């Protein structure tokens, strides 16, 4: 009987350890890895592939990743389980990082981006306005560190098209220095004084 009690106690200890592992690692076996990046899952879809024995299901995840300070990227992951699809999407997004020109927490000028049937218009906004945007656009802008902006979706309502149109708009932004260099003019001649003053305040 004492031996049986020891075996029962050992089993309880192992079960407790398994519970601790589940708490630490969520649904997986490994602990959750902390990351300095912001991650937003925009869409998760289930995909069915018809094979000889029936149908095989998998999941796709559209993920936005950014550092909240002017860097952002998008990734598309596919796997048999949702967490694995998201993880693949995150890694794919990190491979497509690009820098976004900003003035304070807004954008330097109005811009329109298009991708497939998606069309997104972005306009600068004064400090404290916030992100006036729908879900997919908001996810991209927040991950990019843009917190004062006006937006409008003019095309498709498909989240994938909207996300890629938003990224196309951000890639179309130019800093005042880039515009001045392209035109061969001083920065003061191509950028409003209020914009330069706002940027100087942020830098200080």
From Swiss-Prot:
GO MF, any single term: structural constituent of ribosome
Assembly description: Part of the 30S ribosomal subunit. Contacts proteins S4 and S8.
Residue ranges constituting the S5 DRBM domain according to the UniProt record: 37-100
Record's keyword terms, sorted: Ribonucleoprotein, Ribosomal protein, RNA-binding, rRNA-binding
Entry keyword Secreted: no
HAMAP family, sorted: Ribosomal_uS5_B (MF_01307_B)
Record SUPFAM superfamilies: dsRNA-binding domain-like, Ribosomal protein S5 domain 2-like
Role: With S4 and S12 plays an important role in translational accuracy. Located at the back of the 30S subunit body where it stabilizes the conformation of the head with respect to the body.
Keyword rRNA processing attached: no
Domain writeup: The N-terminal domain interacts with the head of the 30S subunit; the C-terminal domain interacts with the body and contacts protein S4. The interaction surface between S4 and S5 is involved in control of translational fidelity.
Gene Ontology cellular-component annotations: small ribosomal subunit
Matching PANTHER family: MITOCHONDRIAL RIBOSOMAL PROTEIN S5 (PTHR48277:SF1)
Region (Disordered): 1-34
Lineage, uppermost ranks: Bacteria, Bacillati, Actinomycetota, Actinomycetes, Micromonosporales
Protein name: Small ribosomal subunit protein uS5
InterPro entries (UniProt xref): Ribosomal_Su5_D2-typ_SF, Ribosomal_uS5, Ribosomal_uS5_bac-type, Ribosomal_uS5_C, Ribosomal_uS5_N, Ribosomal_uS5_N_CS, Ribsml_uS5_D2-typ_fold_subgr
Family: Belongs to the universal ribosomal protein uS5 family.
Single GO BP term: translation
Gene3D superfamilies in the cross-refs: 3.30.160.20, 3.30.230.10
């Amino acid at each position: 009987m004492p031996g049986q009690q020891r075996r029962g106690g050992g089993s309880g200890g192992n079960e407790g350890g398994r519970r601790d592992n589940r708490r630490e690692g969520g649904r997986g076996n490994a602990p959750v890895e902390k990351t300095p990046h912001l991650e937003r899952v925009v869409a998760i879809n289930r995909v069915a592939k018809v094979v000889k024995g029936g149908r095989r299901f998998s999941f796709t995840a559209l993920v936005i990743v950014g550092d909240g300070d002017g860097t952002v990227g998008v990734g598309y992951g596919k796997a048999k389980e949702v967490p694995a699809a998201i993880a693949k999407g995150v890694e794919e997004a990190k491979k497509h990082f690009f820098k976004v020109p900003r003035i304070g927490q807004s954008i330097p000028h109005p811009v329109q981006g298009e991708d497939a049937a998606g069309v997104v218009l972005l306009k600068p906004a004064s400090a404290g306005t916030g992100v006036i945007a729908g879900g997919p656009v908001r996810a991209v802008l927040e991950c990019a560190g843009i917190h004062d902006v006006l937006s409008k979706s003019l095309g498709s309502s498909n989240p994938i098209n909207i996300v890629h149109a938003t990224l196309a708009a951000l890639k179309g932004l130019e800093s005042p220095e880039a515009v001045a260099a392209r035109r061969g003019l001083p920065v003061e001649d191509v950028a409003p004084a209020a914009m330069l003053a706002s940027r100087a305040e942020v830098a200080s």
